Amino acid sequence: MTLKASSNTAPLAAAEATARASADLGRLPEWNLADLYPAMDSPAYLSDVARGEIDCRAFADKWRGKLADITAGPNASEKLTEAVKDYEALEDLLGRIMSYAGLIYSGDTTDPHRAKFYGDAQERITNASSDLLFFTLEINRIDDAALDKAMSAGPLAHYRPWIEDVRREKPYQLDDKLE
């Protein structure tokens, strides 16, 4: 049996037809994303990305390897609440950045400039967020009784639903290096 090169031009024809149809539509409306950032190269966006990278590293330096000891010590509810609030603020910031980048890209997925912008944002935020992976893993290694005690009274009780959601993943959690 000999293999013959395919002469199927259907995908190319479909792409050309889509391009012609898009051109026929004229200028389409665009989302106003100014509530997130004024532009892809705005100082506010660039500053938030840099701050996210720095703050993720600082978060890891401050909290990595310490959650179990904090839970066993005095003022566990207050200290763990501080850690969860720090984590929450970082997740909000990173989410804002990626929401903006994703919406910019979704506005015109054929624009290579937007595709590069989205890819660059994804790479930087993925790298930064790798410094946050330890947090939920460590929460799941805390003794159940100690964590329940910390959540029973004090400000950590506010985060009980989120912590319980994190704890549901405990049976499926892998070793830190594999995660």
Question: Which ranges hold each PLM region?
Answer:
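A well-structured
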Residues: 2-179
